[in-house]
Regions:
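Short beta-strand/loop motif that positions the catalytic acidic residue
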Residues: 106, 112-114, 118
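C-terminal alpha-helix
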Residues: 165-173
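Acidic beta-to-alpha connecting loop that harbors the catalytic carboxylate
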Residues: 100, 116-119, 146-148
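Conserved loop-alpha-helix segment in the C-terminal half of the alpha/beta-hydrolase fold
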Residues: 116, 120-140
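Alpha/beta-hydrolase-fold enzymes
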Residues: 2-84
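Catalytic histidine-centered segment of alpha/beta-hydrolase-like enzymes
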Residues: 141, 147-161
Length: 174
């Protein structure tokens, strides 16, 4: 959504789809850090630290130290991601890189799927959008009450409902 909104008409894509995308990075980070998400938060942070510190990583000693000391995703982004990528701070990074700021720039048919019961990505950012106000009229939001985070398990099918919805949408817009 971020890249599509940023690109506008300058895209080779005929259509796009998004499932459970974190369109508000700050809210998603806060949600992931809730006690009920501690295991997912821990695993995601560990993976991010492992990748950032991996072989061949060109890091300064201060960056390595910041990554190692980060105990939350917020701290990781505050101590490493934001400064490494030229942002003033973590709030600046989250604000400027959140996809909800770019939705109005999307100029291709785009399916947006997000469950209202997603434990990681808060649906409030989706529900707070004025979808009909977007000039492009290219955005189709599907915001079911249930589905979890990329769950959308379909009854009677081994393929998740969201996969079938995305495939149908993209096939229609070929």
């Amino acid at each position: 959504l971020f890249r599509s909104g940023e690109a506008g008409q300058d895209t080779p894509l005929a259509a796009a789809a998004s499932v459970s995308a974190p369109i508000d990075l700050a809210a998603t980070c806060r949600n992931l850090m809730r006690p009920c998400n501690w295991l997912s938060h821990f695993m995601l942070l560990r993976q991010m630290k492992r990748e950032a510190l991996g072989p061949g990583a060109a890091l300064t000693p201060a960056e390595r130290d910041g990554i190692r000391k980060a105990r939350t995703l917020w701290q990781f982004d505050e101590q490493f991601t934001a400064p490494r990528n030229g942002f003033a701070d973590v709030a600046d990074y989250y604000a400027r890189c959140s996809a909800m700021e770019f939705l109005g720039g999307i100029r291709i048919p785009t399916l947006v799927v997000a469950a209202q019961d997603d434990p990681w990505v808060p649906c409030a950012a989706y529900l707070g959008q004025h979808w009909s106000a977007y000039e492009s009229l290219c955005l189709l939001p599907l915001l079911p009450e249930q589905g979890g985070h990329v769950g959308f398990h379909g009854v009677g099918s081994r393929h998740p409902w969201s996969d079938r919805a995305v495939a149908g949408f993209l096939a229609f817009h070929r």
